[in-house]
């Protein structure tokens, strides 16, 4: 039985109805500005004042806001370390080497290039986060497709779909994962073990859909790339990433926050890059994307105000009890719908407190919904919006009708298969 809603606080400046209205209006404003980015402003320019306003008006108490900041602090630190790690890997030439490998092994065949893009995007998303795939791999895929004369659309679209779908595997793959990881109470290795089968199953469905949907583009002629000297393999970056992954497992096993492993990996690459003058302290700060980190924190506070002022009660009636297959499917479906309505980051912030009491299975079902669901619409995730800007910067076209039609084919199938795989994993491995 769910706890009853707490009585209205006495420290409110606004009555409950006005507090709810203000919180919802500010959330809509924050999300709209994050999508549109008026005047090129960072997302934090609107989100931070909005968070301050919900506190100042009493829509959310200062103590509750402080508690939310303390809860999100380690997650934000983890995210910063992973962003720096991904950028430094790019500085080391990891993504250029990946592009050379894709072009060489594709041998002028677009269908084979699609396989290579799926492999590269799946691994990069899982290990270095979806941001690395969107920001760093997408331009490389454009260049690789041009080099062999292939139509870029199937391969570039794969980057955005896999930045969402392939982010299911590890806690570091996506900010939503970090939040779910914290709420689930699972260790790093158990989280990965439970999500491995859903990750692989969803990617497999995506690949089959892409082969059929883009058949005409994939059958178009291409040519083998000219023989050129491949760039040197960035062994130091590869070894550092490998050691960081091992660090995630070891720190989780001994009860230490895995963020320390991410920090160690980022520091190792940063020190090397600074010594070799390949980066600067200012560039490292930019790589951490401080305005985006501030946006995440502010968004969490605004979302908490919305939840505390009535959304939790409204959604509570829609959350199914139990973690059977039907309940997991319902949770994932609800999460996917909510992600496309209000974006996946606020969706996971809203749903995690409501589903965490049901156990890790419910939390992971929500994660599947908020990660795969955004492939249906542009606004489902910030990564998709960023990908669209990158495509336009490379003179590519993204047609809303085509993007949505692809999502209609891919999302329901991959979502259902991933949830079924999660249910099997929970049955075999257990969620405790």
Predicted regions and their residues:
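Juxtamembrane and boundary regions of transmembrane helices in multi-pass small-molecule transporters
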Residues: 150, 189-232, 372-379, 383-432
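Hydrophobic alpha-helical transmembrane segments in multi-pass integral membrane proteins
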Residues: 62-63, 175, 242-252, 298-316, ...
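Interfacial loop-to-helix junctions that mark the boundaries of transmembrane helices
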Residues: 14-19, 38-41, 64-75, 188-198, ...
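Long, contiguous bundles of hydrophobic transmembrane helices that form the permeation core
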Residues: 203-280
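Alpha-helical transmembrane segments and, especially, the helix-loop junctions at the ends
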Residues: 125-135, 152-186, 206-211, 339-352, ...
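Membrane-embedded alpha-helical segments and adjacent helix-loop junctions characteristic
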Residues: 62-153, 291-292, 297-359
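Membrane-interface alpha-helices at helix entry/exit sites of multi-pass transporters
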Residues: 108-116, 146-159, 186-197, 359-368, ...
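Hydrophobic mid-bilayer segments of alpha-helices in multi-pass membrane transport proteins
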Residues: 19-30, 39-60, 72-84, 136, ...
């Amino acid at each position: 039985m769910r706890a009853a809603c707490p009585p209205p606080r006495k420290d409110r400046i606004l009555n409950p109805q006005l507090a709810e209205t203000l919180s919802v209006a500010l959330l809509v404003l924050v999300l709209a500005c994050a999508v549109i980015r008026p005047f090129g402003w960072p997302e934090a320019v609107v989100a931070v004042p909005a968070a301050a306003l919900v506190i100042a008006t009493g829509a959310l108490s200062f103590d509750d806001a402080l508690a939310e900041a303390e809860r999100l602090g380690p997650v934000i630190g983890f995210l910063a370390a992973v962003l720096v790690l991904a950028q430094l890997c790019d500085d080391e030439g990891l993504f250029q080497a990946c592009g050379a490998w894709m072009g060489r092994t594709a041998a002028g065949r677009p269908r084979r290039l699609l396989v290579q893009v799926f492999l590269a995007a799946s691994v990069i998303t899982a290990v270095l986060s979806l941001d690395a795939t969107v920001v760093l791999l997408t331009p490389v895929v454009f260049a690789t497709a041009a080099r062999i004369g292939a139509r870029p659309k199937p391969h570039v679209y794969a980057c955005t779909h896999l930045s969402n779908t392939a982010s299911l595997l590890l806690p570091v793959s996506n900010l939503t994962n970090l939040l779910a990881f914290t709420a689930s109470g699972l260790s790093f290795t158990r989280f990965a073990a439970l999500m491995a089968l859903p990750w692989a199953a969803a990617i497999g469905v995506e690949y089959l859909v892409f082969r059929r949907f883009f058949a005409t583009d994939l059958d178009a002629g291409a040519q083998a790339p000219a023989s050129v000297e491949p760039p040197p393999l960035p062994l130091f970056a590869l070894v550092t990433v490998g050691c960081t992954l091992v660090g995630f497992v070891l720190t989780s096993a001994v009860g230490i926050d895995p963020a320390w492993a991410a920090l160690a990996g980022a520091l190792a690459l940063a020190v090397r890059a600074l010594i070799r003058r390949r980066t600067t302290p200012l560039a490292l700060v930019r790589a951490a994307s401080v305005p985006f980190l501030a946006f995440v924190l502010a968004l969490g506070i605004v979302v908490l105000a919305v939840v505390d002022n009535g959304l939790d009660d409204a959604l509570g009636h829609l959350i199914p009890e139990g973690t059977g297959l039907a309940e997991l499917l319902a949770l994932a479906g609800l999460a996917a719908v909510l992600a496309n309505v209000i974006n996946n980051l606020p969706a996971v912030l809203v749903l995690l407190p409501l589903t965490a009491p049901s156990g890790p299975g419910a939390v992971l079902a929500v994660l599947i919904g908020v990660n795969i669901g955004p492939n249906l619409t542009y606004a489902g995730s910030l990564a998709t919006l960023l990908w669209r800007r990158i495509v336009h910067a490379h003179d590519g076209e993204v047609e809303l009708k085509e993007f949505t039609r692809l999502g209609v084919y891919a999302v329901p199938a991959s979502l259902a298969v991933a949830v079924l795989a999660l249910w099997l994993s929970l049955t075999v491995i257990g969620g405790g």
